[in-house]
Amino acid sequence: MPAPPAPTEEQMAEMAQTAMQLGLPAGTIKISECVPTMGEHWARPQDLPLGPIYGVKDGKLVFVELMPSQEMFAKGMSWVDALKTPKWFLKINHVDIEFQPQGHEGYPIPHYDIHAYFVPHEEHLGYCLPPQ
């Protein structure tokens, strides 16, 4: 799959403004459009693939994600304050932990997707669904 075109200066400025409004770290950019049941994914490129990755829907922060590899867990690695939210007062509603034995696009090795959601499950499961 070919890489998407680099964002324009105007798009970069818009992303910087959105990231600042959400309280995300400087240099955070949108890395995907709206993913069904999750929302847009935002991150600092240097933090990938582990994360943190931030989920945004309609201008609202809805999750923080980490993707530690299976090897990292096997080595006994720890992550302290890894899911600290940029707006620390957001209350985590629930956490989804999924093992990806084959990986997925963007991270094709066995790993865990750990999403700490700030919205109810019923809400994010309705995000960006394809037309039926």
PLM region spans:
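Metal-centered catalytic cores of metalloenzymes
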Residues: 1-132
